[in-house]
């Protein structure tokens, strides 16, 4: 798809040639799904594996939690903003399979079973995601899918599941890991139901082998590369740095139907300052990441909600070109505490983020110029600059010789759209 668009003349040739990290070929899992990064809600980071509904009725992993989240997604504008997948993570299962080896939800916490929950979710226009594992057990120790890939794929399809997050704990050997992912992907396709497959294959395979992203993208709609996100700036920073260091292999793998997954958005929780929440949102959009929030939609500040629901920012993430953004080398090496990323958009536009990585002092000024962009060739004579974050502001046309002073808070980000 990338290649077709590039060759269709939608891009100036200088721009194409200047971009060493632009993918020349993307072959995503051929199920026609996730043509833009999946958006939704996933329980893990915020709710973990709380199974005691007596003591923790408000936050235990139960059908009630998901029904409440489904209602919030519809009535609080999340679905309208694009967040469609309501996803269950680990700890939904009963400790054993049933007499026919079929998976079953914990009967106390999910008395209606997953089918009933799927109906509830679908009735509201949402889609349901579920979690399983390629190995003998899930990471939290519940029954895994090993030896039951076909049966489990069929069970999920029968229940009306729309997305499977497929983890890699207890995988056995590398061959078993890779084979398990292939088999589950094929089995899901064979059910005939549209089920997005979200993998963790590269995360588990990386210590043992060089990850073949072409192959991963043939079997998965998205895949995790790094450790779990936590509710902290150090975690968000680490994910950004990892992604930037490996961008030459990660960026070409991404495209419609196939996404690198830097893990959940933790905006609206406890650990990130306002500026750090802006940074996570801006950079997850630049990275064309799945936007899967893990927060409590029943209790979220108006600011975090507005940030997560910002339609123009989401549009950067959901741009149909499906290009993953990348960190651009600075031409202002004397000041390496600013970090710039750019993401090509359709219609010959760019999204650009400017992060102040200094963790001391106050707002710092950067004299932004379009010549800082990759090879500086996207704007022929002048570009129209719109700031989308932290607040919306139109700066109008900027000549390529002109400089725009911008002030960025410590650990904060300015997100620009350049047309
Ligand atoms: C792994 C995954 C997490 C989460 C937990 C659940 O750590 O990477 O995202 O799914 O397992 O146990």
Region roles according to the model:
Residues 2-3, 13-32:
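N-terminal signal peptide
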Residues 38-43, 82-89, 127-132, 162-167, ...:
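Structural recognition of the beta-strand scaffold that forms the well-ordered cores
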Residues 46-55, 61-62, 67-173:
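Aromatic-lined carbohydrate-binding/catalytic grooves of carbohydrate-active enzymes
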Residues 148-151, 196-296:
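Glycan-recognition surfaces
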Residues 279-332:
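Catalytic cores of secreted or luminal carbohydrate-active enzymes
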Residues 284-287, 292-294, 333-377:
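Carbohydrate-binding surface patches
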Residues 371-392:
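Solvent-exposed beta-hairpin/edge-strand motifs
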Residues 396-419:
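C-terminal beta-strand-rich structural cap/linker in extracellular carbohydrate-active enzymes
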């Amino acid at each position: 798809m990338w290649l077709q668009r590039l060759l269709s003349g939608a891009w100036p040739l200088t721009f194409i040639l200047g971009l060493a990290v632009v993918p020349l070929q993307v072959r995503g899992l051929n199920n026609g799904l996730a043509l833009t990064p999946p958006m939704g809600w996933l329980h893990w980071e915020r709710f973990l594996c709380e199974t005691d509904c007596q003591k923790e009725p408000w936050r235990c992993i139960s059908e009630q939690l998901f029904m409440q989240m489904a209602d919030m997604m519809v009535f609080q504008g999340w679905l309208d903003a694009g967040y469609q997948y309501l996803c269950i993570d680990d700890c939904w299962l009963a400790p054993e399979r049933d007499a026919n080896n079929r998976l079953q939800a914990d009967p106390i916490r999910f008395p209606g079973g997953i089918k009933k929950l799927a109906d509830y979710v679908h009735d509201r226009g949402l889609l349901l995601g579920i979690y399983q594992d390629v190995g003998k057990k899930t990471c939290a120790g519940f029954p895994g899918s090993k030896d039951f890939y076909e049966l489990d794929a069929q069970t999920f399809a029968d229940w009306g599941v729309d997305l499977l997050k497929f983890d890699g704990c207890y995988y056995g050997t590398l061959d078993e890991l890779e084979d398990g992912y292939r088999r589950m992907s094929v089995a899901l396709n064979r059910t005939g139901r549209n089920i997005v497959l979200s993998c963790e294959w590269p995360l588990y395979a990386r210590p043992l082998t060089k990850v073949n992203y072409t192959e991963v993208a043939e079997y998965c709609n998205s895949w995790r590369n790094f450790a779990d996100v936590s509710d902290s700036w150090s975690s968000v920073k680490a994910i950004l740095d990892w992604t930037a260091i490996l961008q030459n292999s990660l960026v070409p793998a991404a495209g419609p139907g196939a996404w690198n997954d830097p893990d959940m958005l933790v905006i609206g929780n406890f650990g990130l300052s306002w500026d750090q929440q802006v940074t996570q949102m801006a950079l997850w959009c630049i990275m064309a990441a799945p936007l899967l929030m893990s927060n409590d939609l029943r209790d979220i500040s108006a600011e975090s909600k507005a940030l997560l629901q910002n339609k123009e920012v989401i549009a950067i993430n959901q741009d149909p070109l499906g290009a993953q953004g990348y960190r651009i080398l600075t031409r202002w090496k004397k000041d390496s505490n600013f970090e710039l990323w750019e993401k090509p958009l359709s219609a010959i536009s760019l999204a650009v983020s400017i992060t102040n990585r200094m963790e001391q002092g106050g707002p710092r000024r950067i004299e932004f110029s379009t010549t800082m962009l990759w090879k500086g060739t996207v704007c022929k004579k002048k570009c129209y600059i719109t700031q989308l974050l932290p607040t919306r502001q139109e700066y109008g046309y900027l000549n390529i010789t002109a400089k725009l002073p911008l002030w960025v808070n410590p650990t904060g980000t300015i997100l620009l759209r350049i047309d």
